[in-house]
Amino acid sequence: MNLMNIEQNAENLRLLGLIVAQRGETIYQHNWDSPCRRLLFSASKSFTGAAVGFAVQEGLLRLDDRLIELFPDEAPENPSENLCRATIRDALTMCIGQSRGYLMGAQRVGMAEEDWAKAVLALPFDEAPGTHFVY
């Protein structure tokens, strides 16, 4: 891979940034645009699903692990029963227990909380996890 070629053609490729890692070490990193939140639309689901699949295969987590146990520092002080029952499987199937989508369009851009996990876990979980699909 010729990284100089990539740098020279980055504008034509419309790259925002590039990180190359080898054996767990970052060997190259360059940003062509300033860091900011980007809407990735449905691409996020593909990356997340693949990452979770690898983590399950490596024994790092299970689909039935509870979100509250994976994100204890991001959880609200008094989590609801529904939030306490929500699992990775529920998150991957978009059935974590919320009755409506809270992070669509302008809501996402205007969100004050920088920590996405903390922001999502602070939202109401008013449905039983696994029972109500919300995009």
Each predicted region: which residue ranges?
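Short linear capping/connector segments at secondary-structure termini
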Residues: N31, C36, R66-A75, G105-Q107
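Extracellular/periplasmic catalytic domains that process cell-envelope and extracellular macromolecules
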Residues: E11-N12, N82-R85, A112, D126
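A short, mixed-charge helix-start or loop-turn motif at secondary-structure junctions
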Residues: N5, W32-S34, E77, P124-P129
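Active-site SXXK
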Residues: G24, L39-D64, A91
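Active-site helix/loop module of the DD-peptidase/beta-lactamase fold
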Residues: E58-Q98, A122
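Catalytic tyrosine of NAD(P)H-dependent dehydrogenase/reductases that use a Tyr as the general acid/base
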Residues: F41, F133-Y135
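A short, well-structured edge-of-sheet supersecondary motif
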Residues: L3-S34
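Short, charged, amphipathic alpha-helices and their helix-cap/turn boundaries
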Residues: E25-T26, I68, M104-A128
